[in-house]
């Protein structure tokens, strides 16, 4: 069976053709601008197989975002520490993703729950071109521990199927992107289930797509491996998208190559 490998293909392109650039962390990168990946979610769940992705962390982080939370305490309760490097001494991260998704502040002093608004539109106006969620709140970026990398996403309905396109301004191709692809693919499944729709495509669009100089050996190892078939996702039925728990999300037939460790650029 022919296995589609859009992520690995882009990883190889950045490795071979990326332009040398410095970055905020001082690490150095190989970078390409304006790239896109497409996944048909109806034929498999896009969890990278050329290295093991820690799917537990993917699920708990998404549930944490959907809670509107921005303190790592809840993640710690579930054994997830992926945000620790950026958290304050009290565990706070400022008004990052979940806060913007669930309680975007307005000039009148109110708050907008963008996830609920998007769901309402999917149910009542599925042809709307305004089914958008943004984490890029310019006025609150100075208070965020880290400005949003995956900043903006849009939903699209056609022929009873829900698709999602994400714009990721800054894309750490080795460590971050496999995680982000899985997270937004899962979110698309959840939003579809809550809207009475089937899943369509997940489209990932990257701005600065980069490989850090200290990830090159790891990338070369990953690209030497033979990709395997994508797993399947099973999602329990819940009355609300905010009711999902970790046990509701099950991935089967995930047979990845071993994990590859690499340093995080902070």
From Swiss-Prot:
**Pathway listed:** Pyrimidine metabolism; dTTP biosynthesis
List UniProt keywords, sorted A-Z: Cytoplasm, Methyltransferase, Nucleotide biosynthesis, Transferase
Under which main EC class is this enzyme filed?
A: transferase
Q: Which residues bind (6R)-5,10-methylene-5,6,7,8-tetrahydrofolate?
A: 54, 172, 265
Catalytic site positions: 149 (nucleophile)
Q: Where in the cell is it found?
A: Cytoplasm
Its primary localisation, in coarse terms, equals cytoplasm
Q: Name one GO biological process term.
A: methylation
Question: Quaternary structure per UniProt?
Answer: Homodimer.
> Can you tell me which family this protein belongs to?
Belongs to the thymidylate synthase family. Bacterial-type ThyA subfamily.
Q: What is this protein called?
A: Thymidylate synthase
- The organism named in the record is Mycobacterium leprae (strain TN)
């Amino acid at each position: 069976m022919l296995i589609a490998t859009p992520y690995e293909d882009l990883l190889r392109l950045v490795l071979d053709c990326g332009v040398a650039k410095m970055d905020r962390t001082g690490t150095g990168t190989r970078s390409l601008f304006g790239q896109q990946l497409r996944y048909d979610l109806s034929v498999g769940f896009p969890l990278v197989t050329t290295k093991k992705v820690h799917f537990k962390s993917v699920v708990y982080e998404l549930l944490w975002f959907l809670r509107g939370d921005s303190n790592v305490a809840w993640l710690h309760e579930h054994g997830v520490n992926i945000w620790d490097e950026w958290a304050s001494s009290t565990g706070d991260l400022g008004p990052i993703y979940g806060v913007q998704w669930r309680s975007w502040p307005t000039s009148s002093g109110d708050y907008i729950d963008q996830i609920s608004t998007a769901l309402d539109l999917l149910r009542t106006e599925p042809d709307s071109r305004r089914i958008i969620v943004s984490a890029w709140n310019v006025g609150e970026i100075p208070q965020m521990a880290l400005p949003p990398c995956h900043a903006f996403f849009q939903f699209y309905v056609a022929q009873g199927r829900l698709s999602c396109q994400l714009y990721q301004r800054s894309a750490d191709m080795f460590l971050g992107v496999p995680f982000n692809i899985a997270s937004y693919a899962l979110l698309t499944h959840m939003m579809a289930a809550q809207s009475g729709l089937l899943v369509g495509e997940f489209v990932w669009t990257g701005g600065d797509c980069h490989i850090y100089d200290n990830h090159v050996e790891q990338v070369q190892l990953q690209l030497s491996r033979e990709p395997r078939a994508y797993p399947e996702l099973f999602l329990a039925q819940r009355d609300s998208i905010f009711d999902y728990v970790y046990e509701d999300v099950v991935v089967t037939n995930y047979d990845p190559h071993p994990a590859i460790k690499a340093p995080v650029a902070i």
